[in-house]
């Protein structure tokens, strides 16, 4: 989860988020090197009296500044495409959960069970218990088994929403009349918080998401108690 005054990304909880974090560091290093080179060239031009105003043709330099940016773009594009395809890939999910966005709450349906569905509303500030987080707690958490591939089917009942959990590397639009898919796989148990990430009306900021990742045995006990 996020912390006050935190700089950088949240701790990765899923393999996809670990890949995204590595890609972020990879791209940031390229940006840093390019920025350093540009600043060095600018400072050299401003601090030296050595100038050459008679150059009419420099094919070697033009070749370098054409090939080098192309190579840099390839170094960015290849890992980006790899992660993009990984995010869409899912084989034999252990569980499927249908998520519907509403103004202004989420509803969840465990499609592998006959009567396991519920609505999830934000807990009012006046009802919070000690240690709970303002604007992030809900009355019904989404309980899921850890270390298993889970398919989330995401849509909306009214307007555009977006179902996002940063520590899992998830952000999928909820579009009326369209079913989008996302994959969840958590490396560890815990509570993971998210929010609606698409402006959807006056109470947009009051649509938190709470995932509770637990061992498979605990999930089976919870699902049996809910049916």
Curated annotation (Swiss-Prot):
InterPro entries: CcO_II (IPR045187), CcO_II-like_C (IPR002429), CcO_II_C (IPR034210), Copper_CuA (IPR001505), Cupredoxin (IPR008972), Cyt_c_oxidase_su2 (IPR014222), Cyt_c_oxidase_su2_TM_dom (IPR011759), Cyt_c_oxidase_su2_TM_sf (IPR036257). PROSITE patterns: COX2, COX2_CUA, COX2_TM. It comes from the Eukaryota. Its EC number is 7.1.1.9. Gene3D superfamilies: 1.10.287.90, Cupredoxins - blue copper proteins. The chain crosses the membrane at residues 15-45, 60-87. PANTHER family: CYTOCHROME C OXIDASE SUBUNIT 2 (PTHR22888:SF9), CYTOCHROME C OXIDASE, SUBUNIT II (PTHR22888). This is Cytochrome c oxidase subunit 2. The gene is MT-CO2.
